[in-house]
C-alpha cells in the first residue's frame, strides 16, 4: 500500500476508536524442551536439538517439563492471575511445514492462569491497567527460513528451509482481554506493555526475553470502531513483531491503513499480517482462523496439571518485586531525576541500563551512552539499540573513559567500532589509535604553536582573561584529533601562556 493510501494518523483517531489486543509468546529458559529431553538453547546447527517427540514420530510420547510448569505459574502470579487448581493440555490442529506432527500441544479451555492485570507506565508517567484474560502453556513450532526473496518473507522466495530445533521449546502465551480507551496513544501503549512484560519475565528469571532472538514475540491485534457506533470492527493480527520499536510502528501503521480503507467505504479482511521493518509496512498473510477452525480436543497422552496449594504459595512468596516498585527503587538508587528516569523507561532500555550498571558502569554514564549515542546510531540504522551492542561492551567503553584512556568524543568512535564488529573496546582503541595522549610533550608542542599563531589571545590570557584560552584549547584539540584530555590541555595552556 502506498503512503498516499494511508490516512493521516490524527485524522484516523478523530474518525475511529482503536481497539487493541495482544498475544505475547514468552520462550522459557528451561534446560530441556516442553515435552521432550531435547536440549533447549538458542543456536546450534539446524535440526540437531530434536527428538522423536519433537518430530511427532510414531510411538513417541510427551512428558511435561516440571520446571516449565513452575515458570508458568510464577508468570501467572506476577501478572496478578488466578492459578487454576487443574489445567489440561489440548491439541491445536493445523497444517504448516514448521509443525511436524500437524498439531501443537497447547491449552484451550483450561489454562494454567487466568483473570489478571498488569500496570503499564505510559511515556507521560501515567499508569494504565491492561487486563489479562489468560496465560497458557504450549510448545513452540519450528522455524522457516525463506530463501530467494528480497525481504526474507515467503513472498518471492524460491524455497523454504525448516529447522525443528525450536519445535517443542516451552512457551507461555499471555493473552490480554480487549483493550479499550487507548485512543491516539495506542502505539505508545503497545510499546509500554511489551516493555513491562519484558521487565517482568527478566525479573522472574524465566526467559532471556531477547526479542531479536524470538525469546519474546508479540502478535498485535488491532481493529477500528467508527466513533459512536458501539460496534467492534474486524481485526487484523500482525504476527511475530520482534522489537519494541516495531510494535509501536506496526500499530500506528495498521491504524492508518485500516482507517483509509474504511473511510473509502471498503471492508477490513480478518487476517494475519506480516510487519516489514525495512519498509515500515504490513502485508497480508493468511485468513485469520477462529478457535473452531483448530478443532481443539484434549491431549490424550498427558494428564491434567494440578499444582498443590503449597507449591503455588511457595512460588508466590518467591516472586521478585513488581516492575513499578523496582523502577522506584532503581530511580532512588541511581539518583536520577524524574525526567532522567522517564527518559530511560520511554526508550525501552531499562533492562540494558540495569545490566550495564551490574557490569560495573556508573548509572549516569550508562544512561548517557544508551539514551544518547547508542540510541542515535540505532535510530539512524532503523533497529533497536539493544540489538547493536551488549551491556558488557558498553560498560567496557565507560571504563576506558573513566580511566582517562578515552575522551567522550573518542568513546563515540569506539562505540561505533564495537557495533561494527571491529572487536572489544580495547581492541578498537588499539587498532584505530584512539587512546588519549598521556605524554605532555606533544601537547606542549601543539600549545606553543597555537599560542604563537594567536598573539592577541596570548595577550588576553596574560591580562587575566582566562576565558580567552578556549580558542587555543580548541585549536590544540583539533591538532591532537581529539586525543587529549581537555582539562589537562587547559591547565597547560595557562601555564605556557605565562611562561612564554
Swiss-Prot record:
The protein's enzyme class: ligase
Gene3D superfamilies assigned to the protein according to its UniProt record, in alphabetical order: 1.10.10.410
E.C. no: 6.3.5.-
A GO term, aspect molecular function: ATP binding
Any GO BP annotation: glutaminyl-tRNAGln biosynthesis via transamidation
Catalytic activities: L-glutamyl-tRNA(Gln) + L-glutamine + ATP + H2O = L-glutaminyl-tRNA(Gln) + L-glutamate + ADP + phosphate + H(+); L-aspartyl-tRNA(Asn) + L-glutamine + ATP + H2O = L-asparaginyl-tRNA(Asn) + L-glutamate + ADP + phosphate + 2 H(+)
Keyword tRNA-binding found: no
Domain of life, per lineage: Bacteria
Keyword tags: ATP-binding, Ligase, Nucleotide-binding, Protein biosynthesis
Oligomer status and interactors: Heterotrimer of A, B and C subunits.
HAMAP family to which the protein is assigned, alphabetical: GatB (MF_00121)
Function per UniProt: Allows the formation of correctly charged Asn-tRNA(Asn) or Gln-tRNA(Gln) through the transamidation of misacylated Asp-tRNA(Asn) or Glu-tRNA(Gln) in organisms which lack either or both of asparaginyl-tRNA or glutaminyl-tRNA synthetases. The reaction takes place in the presence of glutamine and ATP through an activated phospho-Asp-tRNA(Asn) or phospho-Glu-tRNA(Gln).
Entry's family note: Belongs to the GatB/GatE family. GatB subfamily.
Record protein name field: Aspartyl/glutamyl-tRNA(Asn/Gln) amidotransferase subunit B
Organism: Clavibacter sepedonicus
Amino acid at each position: 500500500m502506498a503512503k498516499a493510501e494511508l490516512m493521516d494518523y490524527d485524522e484516523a483517531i478523530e474518525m475511529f476508536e482503536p481497539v487493541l489486543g495482544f498475544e505475547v509468546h514468552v520462550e522459557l529458559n528451561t534446560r530441556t524442551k516442553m515435552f521432550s529431553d531435547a536440549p533447549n538453547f538458542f543456536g546450534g546447527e539446524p535440526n540437531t536439538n530434536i527428538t522423536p517427540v519433537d518430530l511427532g514420530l510414531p510411538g513417541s510420547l510427551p512428558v511435561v517439563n516440571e520446571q516449565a510448569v513452575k515458570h508458568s505459574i510464577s508468570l501467572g502470579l506476577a501478572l496478578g492471575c488466578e492459578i487454576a487448581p487443574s489445567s489440561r493440555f489440548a491439541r491445536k490442529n493445523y497444517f504448516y511445514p514448521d509443525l511436524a506432527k500437524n498439531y501443537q500441544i497447547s491449552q484451550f479451555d483450561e489454562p494454567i492462569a487466568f483473570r489478571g492485570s498488569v500496570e503499564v507506565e505510559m511515556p507521560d508517567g501515567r499508569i494504565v491497567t491492561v487486563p489479562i484474560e489468560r496465560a497458557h502453556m504450549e510448545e513452540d513450532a519450528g522455524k522457516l527460513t525463506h530463501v530467494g526473496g528480497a525481504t526474507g518473507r515467503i513472498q518471492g522466495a524460491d524455497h523454504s528451509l525448516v529447522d525443528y530445533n525450536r519445535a517443542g521449546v516451552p512457551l507461555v502465551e499471555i493473552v490480554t482481554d480487549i483493550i479499550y480507551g487507548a485512543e491516539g496513544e495506542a502505539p505508545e501503549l503497545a510499546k509500554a506493555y511489551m516493555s513491562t512484560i519484558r521487565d517482568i519475565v527478566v525479573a522472574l528469571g524465566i526467559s532471556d526475553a531477547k526479542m531479536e532472538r524470538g525469546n519474546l514475540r508479540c502478535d498485535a491485534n488491532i481493529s477500528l470502531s467508527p466513533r459512536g457506533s458501539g460496534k467492534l470492527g474486524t481485526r487484523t493480527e500482525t504476527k511475530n513483531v520482534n522489537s519494541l520499536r516495531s510494535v509501536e510502528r506496526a500499530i500506528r501503521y495498521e491504524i492508518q491503513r485500516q482507517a483509509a480503507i474504511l473511510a473509502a467505504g471498503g471492508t477490513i479482511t480478518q487476517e494475519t499480517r506480516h510487519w516489514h521493518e525495512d519498509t515500515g509496512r504490513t502485508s497480508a498473510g493468511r485468513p485469520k482462523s477462529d478457535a473452531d477452525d483448530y478443532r481443539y480436543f484434549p491431549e490424550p497422552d498427558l494428564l491434567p496439571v494440578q499444582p498443590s496449594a503449597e507449591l503455588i504459595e511457595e512460588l508466590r512468596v518467591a516472586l521478585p518485586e513488581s516492575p513499578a516498585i523496582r523502577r522506584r527503587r532503581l530511580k532512588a538508587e541511581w539518583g536520577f531525576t524524574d525526567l532522567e528516569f522517564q527518559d530511560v523507561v520511554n526508550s525501552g532500555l531499562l533492562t540494558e541500563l540495569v545490566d550495564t550498571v551490574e557490569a560495573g558502569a556508573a548509572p549516569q554514564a550508562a544512561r548517557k551512552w544508551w539514551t544518547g549515542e547508542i540510541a542515535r546510531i540505532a535510530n539512524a540504522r532503523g533497529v533497536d539499540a539493544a540489538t547493536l551492542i551488549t551491556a558488557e561492551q558498553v560498560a567496557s567503553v565507560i571504563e576506558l573513559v573513566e580511566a582517562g584512556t578515552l575522551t567522550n568524543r573518542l568513546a563515540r568512535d569506539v562505540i561505533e567500532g564495537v557495533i561494527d564488529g571491529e572487536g572489544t573496546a580495547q581492541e578498537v582503541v588499539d587498532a584505530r589509535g584512539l587512546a588519549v595522549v598521556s605524554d605532555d610533550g606533544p601537547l606542549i608542542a601543539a600549545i606553543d604553536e597555537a599560542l604563537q599563531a594567536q598573539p592577541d589571545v596570548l595577550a588576553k590570557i596574560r591580562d587575566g582573561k582566562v576565558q580567552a584560552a578556549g580558542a587555543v584549547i580548541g585549536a590544540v584539540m583539533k591538532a591532537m584529533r581529539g586525543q587529549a584530555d581537555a582539562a589537562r590541555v587547559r591547565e597547560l595552556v595557562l601555564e605556557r601562556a605565562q611562561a612564554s
